[in-house]
Amino acid sequence: HGKFRRQRQMCIRDSYSIASSPDYEPGTVHLTVGIVRYNHHDRDKTGLCTGFLADRCQVEETDIGVFMSPTRSFVLPSDGSVDAIMVGPGTGIAPFRAFLQQRDINGDTGRNWLFFGDWTEEGEYYYRDEMESWKERGLLDKHDLAWSRQGSEKVYVQHLMKKNGEEIWKWIDGGGYFYVCGDKNYMAKDVHTTLIEICAEFGSMTPDEAKDFVETKLMKTEKRYLRDVY
């Protein structure tokens, strides 16, 4: 029974968006994992998979089974000259790091705009050095940051979208892609609502027309609004 339990504990399976391009650093896969830790009825709890990766995996000493599941529905534009707006707060930044690496390797000329955020700049600015380097080089044309626990005002990515609504509309109206990755319960819904509001205001549409434009034309017909939410 003890052996069976031990084996069961090792059969942990979870899915993560890959945070690296296979062409950028061949032979490696990078993940962006948020450790789940919380207190329940005065007992400290840790997520099975994230706790295993954080607390029990010894670097270069632990073998982990990896199963790749390629997606054909959350990919870069086939035309490298197309602009891309990426909204990925928290660990939602993962695929966009991979996207930017790939666009860098490809020499794509399309503009890149990243909306990122988390609690604080000091504690959760993931891949800061890379992002700032890409911004300096011009690979990352625009980089908007939202910190929800820094200062007196809570700022989220959808607030920065509203602030940049007119320019977002210009990118989309010009054929740009719009990507969202991360929390589906709150963030993705708020971003979706904000995108519809932006299209209504700056695309001269009624609320119903904007909703149809986003949910039918962008998402289903042209597939320029792509989501990886969890």
Model-derived regions, located:
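Active-site beta-strand/loop microenvironment that shapes enzyme catalytic pockets
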Residues: G80-R103
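Reductase modules of NAD(P)H-dependent flavoproteins
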Residues: E25-P26, H30, I35-V75, D104, ...
